[in-house]
């Protein structure tokens, strides 16, 4: 399929169809029956109407043919659908991450805690949320916690009707992460597919479409349970701003939530990001999808070769460039180094990733590498 050219809409247009119709009429009936093809003629009106319909039909046929192949498709949603066939999920927008320093002006007699998902922000209003509880131990002045750009929402997205393969859309666009689905006060489990599950497994899968709308999909009652008729479905998700979250040092300085000590007293704290936030990226481009989907299929969902490591690193959200090197130094053996760059603050720029992003990438690669690597 490499090098496949798009079908060009040049062989037949409206004018060509009109001309072809007139020639066929002349050949079939001769000039004695119909020789007036001027635009004010009623017969010409019928020819023009037929040409309009035929022109439209040919356009859609060409378009359909182009959208049926990975190399020639131009619509993002069609590419997403084709990538499902080879097990590749195009990268959605990714939120930036950064380490946040949290400090107090003087030591406190008890621990001071800022709970997970507390909101902090830049002066421009860009919101970050802490990923874990941040605790300043008694007698200490500061601690650090990782934070991710974006805002978390919980929403009731619908009511089950008890049928197979129910789908529910999240109301907001810009979804970067679907965190939890709760039905009847019970959290259901995420699954990549329904293949290996039974009717008792309370599972769901998710999709984020070309317009960054999140969708929750349930199974058929055989390979995964169906939510009972009348049950409300609640979803918790994050909405982010992609590359805009790659903010400069010393810009995340506002606290939107409250820190408290062990007695429940409110404690004044300060926050700051001493490093660049990194890893924020826009949805994968159409050109990148066409390039990387075949490469990902060749990995067969495991890291073995040098190219596999590069492919999986590039597949991780927030990584703009990756290069895997084997035996870089003399006497090293089969040691693999992966050099990566994250997305910069502006589109088509790159930056050095922070430690938070690099550690997250290593955890991701651990799921696919060989046990001996």
Task: Give the location of each predicted region.
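Immediate N-terminus of the mature polypeptide
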Residues: 1-71, 178, 186-268
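Extended assembly-interface regions of large multimeric machines
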Residues: 1-175
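Carbohydrate-recognition loop of C-type lectin domains
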Residues: 2-21, 25, 300-373
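Extracytoplasmic
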Residues: 95, 213, 333-335
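Flexible glycine-/small-residue-rich
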Residues: 102-104, 220, 237, 326, ...
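Residue-level signal for inorganic ion chemistry
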Residues: 117, 181, 313
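Acidic, glycine-rich low-complexity/disordered segments
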Residues: 136-183, 197-198, 211, 215-216, ...
């Amino acid at each position: 399929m490499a090098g496949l050219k798009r079908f060009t809409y040049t062989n037949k247009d409206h004018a060509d169809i009109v001309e072809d119709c007139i020639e066929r009429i002349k050949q079939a009936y001769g000039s004695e029956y119909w020789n007036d093809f001027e635009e004010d003629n009623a017969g010409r009106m019928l020819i023009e109407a037929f040409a309009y319909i035929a022109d439209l039909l040919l356009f859609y046929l060409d378009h359909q043919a182009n959208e049926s192949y990975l190399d020639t498709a131009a619509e993002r949603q069609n590419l997403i659908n084709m990538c499902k066939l080879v097990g590749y999920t195009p990268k959605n927008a990714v939120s930036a991450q950064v380490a946040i320093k949290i400090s107090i002006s003087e030591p406190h007699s008890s621990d001071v805690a800022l709970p997970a998902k507390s909101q902090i922000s830049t002066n421009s209003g860009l919101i970050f949320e802490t990923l874990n509880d941040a605790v300043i131990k008694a007698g200490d002045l500061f601690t650090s916690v990782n934070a991710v750009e974006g805002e978390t929402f919980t929403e009731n997205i619908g009511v089950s009707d008890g049928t197979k393969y129910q789908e529910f859309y999240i109301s907001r666009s810009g979804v970067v992460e679907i965190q939890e689905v709760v039905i009847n006060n019970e959290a259901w489990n995420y699954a990549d597919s329904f293949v290996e599950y039974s009717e008792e497994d309370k599972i769901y899968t998710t999709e984020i479409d070309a317009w960054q709308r999140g969708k929750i999909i349930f199974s058929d009652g055989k390979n995964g349970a169906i939510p009972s008729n009348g049950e409300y479905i609640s979803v918790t998700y994050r909405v982010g701003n992609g590359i805009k979250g790659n903010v400069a040092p010393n810009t995340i300085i506002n606290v939107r939530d409250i820190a408290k000590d062990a007695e429940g007293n409110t404690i004044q704290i300060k926050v700051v990001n001493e490093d660049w936030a990194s890893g924020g990226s826009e949805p994968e481009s159409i050109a990148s999808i066409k390039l990387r989907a075949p490469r990902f299929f060749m990995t067969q969902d495991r890291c073995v070769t040098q190219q596999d490591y590069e492919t999986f690193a590039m597949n991780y959200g927030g990584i703009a460039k990756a290069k895997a090197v084997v035996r870089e130094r003399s006497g090293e053996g089969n040691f693999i180094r992966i050099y990566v760059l994250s997305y910069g603050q502006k589109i088509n720029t790159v930056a050095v990733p922070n430690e938070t992003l690099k550690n997250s990438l290593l955890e991701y690669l651990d799921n696919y590498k060989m046990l001996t690597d």
